[in-house]
Design a protein with these regions (language model features):
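Initiator methionine at the very start of the polypeptide chain
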Residues: 1-2, 120
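N-terminal low-complexity, intrinsically disordered segments
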Residues: 3-44
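Intrinsic-disorder/low-complexity peptide segments enriched for small residues
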Residues: 5-11, 35, 66, 80, ...
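Generic low-complexity, intrinsically disordered sequence content enriched
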Residues: 11-12, 17, 41, 63-64, ...
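A general marker of short, structured functional hotspots
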Residues: 14, 29, 36, 46, ...
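Intrinsic-disorder-associated interaction segments
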Residues: 23-30, 34, 40, 49-53, ...
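Acidic, low-complexity, intrinsically disordered interaction modules
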Residues: 48-94
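Polybasic, proline/glycine-rich intrinsically disordered low-complexity segments
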Residues: 77-120
Length: 120
């Protein structure tokens, strides 16, 4: 059985159920992000979004040709999760303003690996 892809706009440390964990974060290009997710989709991975920003969810739906839900649920890490963070580029953030029109280049894409224990 395939695992699940988790899409977040940030990684809350309270979502990690370990006393000690090692976290590796790798920034991805737009192309690499699309390619990785499309490959996982083809392999039958479930994609779960914990992103509540509608414009980001709408853009991801277009980029990946899938249906996602806007979600305000709390994420809890599971060992088989493949975690991706999709967040607004700092230069696009305007305090107190809702961004409604996004292009793929307005976002930054990360792949996150979370491992129980200290590996540093």
């Amino acid at each position: 059985m395939a695992g699940r892809i988790v899409l977040l706009n940030a990684l809350p440390l309270t979502a990690i159920p370990y006393d000690t964990a090692t976290i590796l974060v790798k920034q991805l290009s737009i192309e690499r992000f699309r390619e990785e997710l499309r490959n996982f989709i083809e392999k039958g991975y479930e994609i779960v979004s914990y992103i509540r920003h509608k414009a980001t969810v709408d853009l991801l739906e277009k980029m990946l040709n899938i249906k996602l839900n806007v979600s305000s649920e709390l994420y809890k890490f599971s060992e088989n999760d493949l975690v991706y963070i999709v967040t607004l580029a700092p230069e696009k953030v305007v305090r107190g303003q809702e961004i409604t029109d996004l292009k793929p280049g307005d976002l930054i894409y990360y792949y996150v690996v979370i491992v129980k224990g200290a590996w540093i």
